[in-house]
């Protein structure tokens, strides 16, 4: 069994040993606190079929919990929208916010295992930054993660992945993610 007290995620130790120094040299920061770091990763799964069957949100939350290694929170509608047959407080999806060691573990699994399993994968878009150093991407199917059993999946669901950093600009955030071997196309 692993000794939990001495365990450090691979990307966290990579950040401490190599990434910080490379970013400090590349952007010539004067203070170590200026060096960008990962803040959190948010996984969001919207379930459109939840309007007809609210049980699908629970199965989506269970799958998202297995992927993240942390319990998912069910999200509810803020307002009623008659055109979409949505009532206020109706469950519509689920989300998980990862921080600390779980965040580094998830990013490692995403980059090394899940993204290469995506069909016709050539890399992720390099222009999906929000202008403040956060990166957003989407996956069309949840079974690119090894935690999901293909035979037990009722419905193919996609998810949004938002990687929040402390970087001030998109260039700094992209350099940080490139140091973690994020496979950008451009």
Swiss-Prot record:
Keyword entries, A-Z:
Ribonucleoprotein, Ribosomal protein, RNA-binding, rRNA-binding, tRNA-binding
- InterPro entries assigned: Ribosomal_uL5 (IPR002132), Ribosomal_uL5_bac-type (IPR020930), Ribosomal_uL5_C (IPR031309), Ribosomal_uL5_CS (IPR020929), Ribosomal_uL5_dom_sf (IPR022803), Ribosomal_uL5_N (IPR031310)
| Positions of disulphide bridges | none
Q: Could you state one GO cellular component term attached to this entry?
A: ribosome
**Highest taxon, organism lineage:** Bacteria
One annotated GO biological process: translation
Gene Ontology molecular function:
rRNA binding; structural constituent of ribosome; tRNA binding
Family in the record: Belongs to the universal ribosomal protein uL5 family.
Function in brief: This is one of the proteins that bind and probably mediate the attachment of the 5S RNA into the large ribosomal subunit, where it forms part of the central protuberance. In the 70S ribosome it contacts protein S13 of the 30S subunit (bridge B1b), connecting the 2 subunits; this bridge is implicated in subunit movement. Contacts the P site tRNA; the 5S rRNA and some of its associated proteins might help stabilize positioning of ribosome-bound tRNAs.
Subunit and interaction comment: Part of the 50S ribosomal subunit; part of the 5S rRNA/L5/L18/L25 subcomplex. Contacts the 5S rRNA and the P site tRNA. Forms a bridge to the 30S subunit in the 70S ribosome.
Record protein name field: Large ribosomal subunit protein uL5
Gene coding for it: rplE
């Amino acid at each position: 069994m692993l000794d939990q007290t001495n365990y450090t995620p691979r990307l966290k130790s990579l950040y401490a040993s190599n990434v910080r120094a490379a970013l400090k040299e590349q952007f010539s920061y004067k203070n170590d606190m200026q060096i960008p770091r990962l803040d959190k990763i948010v996984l969001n799964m919207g379930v459109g079929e939840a309007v007809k069957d609210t049980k699908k949100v629970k199965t989506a939350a269970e799958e998202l919990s297995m992927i993240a290694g942390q319990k998912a929170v069910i999200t509810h509608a803020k307002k009623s929208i008659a055109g979409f047959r949505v009532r206020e407080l109706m469950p519509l999806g689920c989300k998980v916010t990862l921080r600390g060691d779980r965040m580094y573990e998830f990013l490692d699994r995403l980059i090394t295992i899940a993204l290469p399993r995506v069909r016709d994968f050539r890399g992720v878009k390099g222009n999906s930054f929000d202008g403040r150093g956060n990166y957003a991407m989407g996956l069309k199917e949840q079974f690119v993660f090894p935690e999901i059993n293909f035979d037990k999946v009722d419905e193919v669901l996609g998810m949004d992945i938002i990687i929040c950093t402390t970087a001030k600009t998109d260039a700094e955030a992209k350099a940080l993610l490139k140091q973690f071997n994020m496979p950008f196309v451009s």
